From Swiss-Prot:
pH-activity note: Optimum pH is 8.2.
Protein's recorded name: 1-aminocyclopropane-1-carboxylate synthase 2
Enzyme kind, highest EC tier: lyase
Posttranslational modification: Phosphorylated on serine residue by MAP kinase (MPK6). May be processed at its C-terminus.
Keywords: Ethylene biosynthesis, Fruit ripening, Lyase, Phosphoprotein, Pyridoxal phosphate, S-adenosyl-L-methionine
Subunit (UniProt): Homodimer and heterodimer. In vivo, the relevance of heterodimerization with other ACS enzymes is however unsure. Interacts with GRF3.
Modified residues (N6-(pyridoxal phosphate)lysine): 279
PROSITE patterns: AA_TRANSFER_CLASS_1
Pathway: Alkene biosynthesis; ethylene biosynthesis via S-adenosyl-L-methionine; ethylene from S-adenosyl-L-methionine: step 1/2
InterPro entries tied to this protein: Aminotransferase_I/II_large (IPR004839), Ethylene_sulfur-biosynth (IPR050478), NHTrfase_class1_PyrdxlP-BS (IPR004838), PyrdxlP-dep_Trfase (IPR015424), PyrdxlP-dep_Trfase_major (IPR015421), PyrdxlP-dep_Trfase_small (IPR015422)
UniProt binding sites for substrate: 55, 93
UniProt family annotation: Belongs to the class-I pyridoxal-phosphate-dependent aminotransferase family.
Length: 496
């Protein structure tokens, strides 16, 4: 498929021809490989298993049961067809009132009932992808900068930058401190941006973190709220994994911090939340994204922009009924947390048998897997990509390399465990264990060689190497974004 003429770019816009969509990365290449050879237990048992999709399929049976028991919630049933004419007509772009009320109520429940949300501040969007872009259009102009702790969600370059012209500066976080974000690190990145004459408009967090599966504690979140208030920059918190916590305490929303912190220490007009039902409810196909802002002007602007990415009225109607069913919601959230905890334990126990460790986590639909000991060169991103190719081509697993998430240390991989049935997970774990077992001698020899190299390096040389890695990472960030192309309908480029 192509356009006539030799100079195809001449008839297209700058957005259509720029290199900022982000499709040409290993994160998306893994999806393309999977699309060509998808695993199936019986039809294609030697195919690639999809472990690059952060999708929550563990409780779809509960939703199916609710739909069967509540046929009146849909206009596509005999019990609900009487609502068809009303729902089929144009609706308020702000959304059905009962839908916004139900969403606000559910957001409170997903955060343990410790905070309430105002339905009038709920703005709809087509998934979290649309919500993230909408908030960027509301807050920033082309060339403005947002700081984001790295590693961060691989598709943020698309969601936040591609059409808005906003720039991202990573806030590097280290494995030596379990990739924890500190105010000092944010301050460092802020100063670096200023030294480059960049206008910093805000800080973006994912909490719980994608890809780490960790949560920010209340003290850290409070200090970051104070930080953005001092700098007079925005704080956008992506909380789409709020209800995926399965251990280690309660999730703390930035809304809870706003309620508890002294009013003199926070400018609430700077605080914004992105949410969706894709992860917590396992409904990415419903395309329900939410912008929730404490700033009246942002709410007003986002409402106007929502006309470009509405949630269908039919979807709103059914979800308004489902999310208003307190008994169902309470049971769903409890059971989802329980099943995620079991699945996480099964996965981490399975890879531990292969002498593979993960970052300690308690939320999300994935694990941050440490494969540094399998690298040919532990200081090389090239070695990381070599290993990734082996995992894709030989082990037949689509996992995502850390460099796709702008991690500054080679050898970390995100691997998703909630998007498959138990039998498929068993096959995936078997493949991992078999691969490590067959290559164990090579791994031991490689580790010995790496240890000797490290011992021979001075502290000064190590410091230089770490700095050089960050510079290499920056070049990777600037050069590794590709022009858009024609995408598979199953591509994550089209998903939240």
């Amino acid at each position: 498929m192509g356009l006539p003429g030799k100079n195809k770019g001449a008839v297209l816009s700058k957005i259509a021809t720029n290199n900022q969509h982000g499709e040409n990365s290993e994160y998306f290449d893994g999806w393309k490989a999977y699309d060509k050879d998808p695993f199936h237990l019986s039809r294609n048992p030697h195919g690639i298993i999809q472990m690059g999709l952060a999708e929550n399929q563990l409780c779809l049976d509960l939703i199916k049961d609710w739909v069967k028991e509540n046929p009146e919630a849909s206009i596509c049933t005999l019990e609900g067809i009487h609502q068809f004419s009303d729902i089929a007509n144009f609706q308020d772009y702000h959304g059905l009132k009962k839908f916004r009320q139900a969403i606000a109520h559910f957001m409170g429940k997903a955060r343990g009932g410790r905070v309430t949300f105002d339905p009038e501040r709920v703005v709809m969007s087509g998934g979290a992808t649309g919500a993230n872009e909408t908030i960027m259009f509301c807050l920033a102009d082309p060339g403005d900068v947002f700081l984001i702790p790295s590693p961060y969600y691989a598709a943020f370059d698309r969601d936040l930058r591609w059409r808005t012209g906003v720039e991202i500066i990573p806030v590097p976080c280290s494995s030596s401190d379990n990739f924890k974000l500190t105010v000092d690190a944010a301050e460092w990145a802020y100063k670096k941006a200023q030294e480059s004459n960049k206008k910093v408009k805000g800080l973006i967090l994912t909490n719980p973190s994608n890809p780490l599966g960790t949560m920010l504690d209340k003290d850290t979140l409070t200090n970051l709220v104070r930080f953005v208030t001092r700098k007079n920059i925005h704080l956008v918190v992506d909380e789409i994994y709020a209800a995926t916590v399965f251990a280690g305490g309660d999730f703390v929303s930035v809304a809870e911090v706003v309620n508890d912190v002294d009013i003199s220490e926070v400018n609430v007009d700077l605080i914004h939340i992105v949410y969706s039902l894709s992860k917590d409810m396992g409904l990415p196909g419903f395309r329900v994204g939410i912008v929730y802002s404490f700033n009246d002007s942002v709410v007003s602007c986002a409402r106007k922009m929502s006309s470009f990415g509405l949630v269908s009225s039919q979807t709103q109607l059914m979800l308004a009924s489902m999310l208003s069913d307190d008994q169902f919601v309470d049971n769903f959230l409890m059971e989802s947390s329980r099943r995620l905890g079991i699945r996480h334990k099964v996965f981490t126990t399975g890879i531990k048998k292969a002498d593979i460790a993960c970052l300690t986590s308690n939320a999300g639909l994935f694990a941050w897997m440490d494969l540094r000991h399998l690298l040919r060169d532990r200081n090389s991103f090239e070695s990381e990509i070599e290993l990734w190719h082996i995992i894709i081509d030989r082990v037949k697993l689509n996992v995502s390399p850390g460099s796709s998430f702008r991690c500054t240390e080679p050898g970390w991989f995100r691997i998703c465990f909630a998007n498959m049935d138990d039998d498929t997970l068993h096959v995936a774990l078997g493949r991992i264990q078999d691969f490590v077992s067959k290559n164990k001698n090579k791994i031991v020899e490689k580790a010995s060689e790496n240890d000797q190299v490290i011992q021979n390096k001075s502290a000064k040389k190590l410091k230089w190497t770490q700095t050089n890695l960050r510079l290499s990472f920056r070049r990777l960030y600037e050069d590794g974004l590709s022009s858009p192309g024609i995408m598979s309908p199953h591509s994550p480029l089209l998903r939240a």
